């Protein structure tokens, strides 16, 4: 249940009834401190200013017509005109009882939309590196959240599977085949193979001529080139899938929608943009001039969509991509989880898309940009030698470090269980360290912090779940055995319950903002509220009615943490 939305509607109605213009914002927010109630309506002062009336007097008028019977225990004016709302304990308890017996723990499904989410997007013939981590796991957390809310989500892995580099790769494949009769198709070999191909292309003119010829052949549908290209894609995606599976990322080969997928659309798009008068010839190239973007001379910036040699650009592909997602996938909303450095490029492509009428304004095109992963020196995360860190190497190191941690914490566990726990904690630590940071900011990657059992970390959250779940196990009862209702007698109980019932608000915030850190913040706060409750309120030793009430709170906490972590793509453990 979205309590914030419920109260916001009630306050909005009261504002209008008190004389505010229709549509005046109630601005209901969760209260920062318990002494200010559960929710606070902050819109009164702005409305009072427009009406030219005293904010506190107007706030009283709003309260006089505010219908929160049975929902709020008390409503009071604070400061210059804030309205503090204290929810009724019995009403909260009833909502918790409903959530306990609901598979969705009280979260309502939204009206279904078709939502395309573009994320991960590694390049073919190269191994995934740490630069791919943020797009992959942030995008996947949002995908899981949107699906949980009932939307039809299309995962779009826009891999880099096209371009002139394939000419040099195929030329080198042919050379090796001619010399040895076979070609290794392991991605680790391909990484070196790529560098070798580039060196040959730069230093051997005869090789470069052959490479350029292969580009033309590939674009013309040559059978041999198409076969070699497909092998390169297949080998790359097999290795990428290993990384996805290790990270518990929901992408599969079926979700690949690479650059090449839109090739057939590109000539038609250029022709259509010319016909619409949007594209004009400039120095032999086809260019769209955008008035909203100026060059250094103050003139409209030209965006090239076809080079003078007839070749197309990334912008042309992105125009086609947006058009396809609306026309063929019936998208209501398209989310791109792409590096912040691509922002202007995307905005220009989408400007052309809108001007051409390919995607109507009611369909949102959203760039959810993200910052960089930095080392402790504040520079882009690199190996000691200054090279790019392979994602697989990062995950391997995380497993080694987690294994040492689990061995120190629980040396008596059998080897198989320690290994399972270490792998689960390792992947969770890498993901949560990233997901818990604001998406748009850079963050420092720190092994010690991310594997700590204190603070807003994966090990802390996984342990919090294990601890809560173990209480219910020790009680040795099922939910059906708990016949006594939830009754709130302690402020720690109320603080926990109020936070538990804000889960839907956290889910909706992630879905709307594309910000998984909001879920991490919520779960960390929830774990803290449970810890305070557990210290202040005995559970198993309490008298039966109180014991059952508190066991229900513990169970709802465990279910909520588990569901929240699952939306982040993080697995829980029954013991650590």
Swiss-Prot record:
A Gene Ontology cellular-component term: cytoplasm
Enzyme class: ligase
Catalytic activity: tRNA(Arg) + L-arginine + ATP = L-arginyl-tRNA(Arg) + AMP + diphosphate
Motif placement: 'HIGH' region: 122-132
GO MF term list: arginine-tRNA ligase activity; ATP binding
Keywords associated with the record: Aminoacyl-tRNA synthetase, ATP-binding, Cytoplasm, Ligase, Nucleotide-binding, Protein biosynthesis
Subunit structure: Monomer.
Family of the protein in this entry: Belongs to the class-I aminoacyl-tRNA synthetase family.
Listed name of the protein: Arginine--tRNA ligase
